[in-house]
Amino acid sequence: MARMPSAERRRQLTEAAIRAMARDGVAKTTTRSIAAEAGVSLSVFHYCFDSKQALIEAVITTLTDHSVTVVKEALRPRDTLEETVAAGFRAYWDHVRAHPEAHMLTYELTQYALREPGFEHLARRQYELYGEAYAELIEQLRRDMDLELRVPVSVLARYLAAMTDGLTLNYLVLGDAAAWADILDTVTAHIAGLVR
């Protein structure tokens, strides 16, 4: 096994944990199965992560980063605010449809953290990350498109996180991809209405 900087090894183990957890479930994923998935010894795993909490926090952060990166790449100013917002949501939705197992894992991680004593703060952190990501995207759009919001950024960010969360869960449960176009139009029109 080649030596690798610890930050890179942590990323490797985090991605392996995401694959193992998405496949086997959070509760059934062990440190051994993650090490095997990454192709490293168990001692390497324990060198990189001193607790299961640290691993789960890394998984939550990485999953959030995956989704945010997809949206950021798509969210560049277009001719209208509606087109810009629609492009961001479309990119996110394409990610959900392409990686449903990763998005299911986010809900499983939330439930696991809420039920596991001492892990509750990780569920809170997960949703704080969602709000922070939306606030950053909103601020970027506000600057780039010279927008004036009708509500504070923090309120809009939390609202968008809750709405996206609900839409994602609805899709994962019902699997109605055909309905997305109408939903996207409704969401886009509503968001545009929150801007002057």
Where on the chain are the PLM-derived regions?
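Hydrophobic alpha-helical connector segments
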Residues: 58, 72-102, 153-160
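Solvent-exposed, amphipathic alpha-helical segments
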Residues: 16-23, 70-74, 105, 109, ...
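Amphipathic alpha-helical packing segments from all-alpha helical-bundle domains
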Residues: 68, 98-104, 117-143, 185
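Helix-turn-helix
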Residues: 9-12, 19-58
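Short helix-capping/turn signature of helix-turn-helix
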Residues: 49, 108-115
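Short, basic, alpha-helical segments at the C-terminal edge of helix-turn-helix-like DNA-binding modules
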Residues: 61-67
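Hydrophobic/aromatic-rich alpha-helical bundle segments in the mid-to-C-terminal region
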Residues: 118-124, 141-195
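N-terminal intrinsically disordered/low-complexity leader segments
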Residues: 1-8
